[in-house]
Design a protein with these regions (language model features):
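Active-site beta3 strand of CheY-like receiver
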Residues: 45-50
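Active-site residues of response regulator receiver
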Residues: 52, 82
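C-terminal output helix
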Residues: 106-115
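Short hydrophobic/Thr-rich beta-strand motif most characteristic of the beta2 strand and flanking loop
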Residues: 25-32, 40
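Receiver (REC) domain active-site loop signature in two-component systems and cognate sites
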Residues: 55
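Charged docking surfaces used in two-component/phosphorelay signaling
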Residues: 15-23
Length: 120
């Protein structure tokens, strides 16, 4: 089964994402912020990345930009999971290489449906 990197500085949100994904059979690795995620992504390969936008140390947009620069992550689906619903943040995410966008609070079925869609 696919392995997904879940990135959020909120422990409760990470746990909710991980619980939803594990319940659907995915393997999940959690990261507390963009720096933690980048370190994990350099040492392990992930099939999909789900990241918050607003985080300390390295935000989700910077994380996606940095991951896209790595050869292993040029085509990896990357979803932004955030309270930010504004058009300019969405555009920044797209420009950085985000595959999709889910607004918090999210519906677990919506998260799974979106993951399945972007992972083909």
């Amino acid at each position: 089964m696919a392995t997904i990197l879940a990135v959020d500085d909120s422990a409760s949100m990470r746990q909710m994402v991980a619980f939803t994904l594990k319940g659907a059979g995915y393997n999940v690795v959690e990261a507390v912020d963009g720096l933690d995620a980048l370190t994990k992504a350099k040492s392990q390969s992930f099939d999909c990345v789900v990241t918050d936008v607003n985080m300390p140390n390295k935000d989700g947009i910077e994380l996606i930009r940095d991951l896209r620069a790595l050869p292993n992550y040029k085509f990896t689906p990357m979803l932004m999971l955030t309270t930010e619903a504004g058009a300019d943040k969405k555009q920044q995410g797209k420009d950085a290489g985000a595959t999709g966008w889910i607004v918090k609070p999210f519906n677990p079925d919506q998260l799974l449906k979106t993951i399945k869609k972007v992972m083909g």
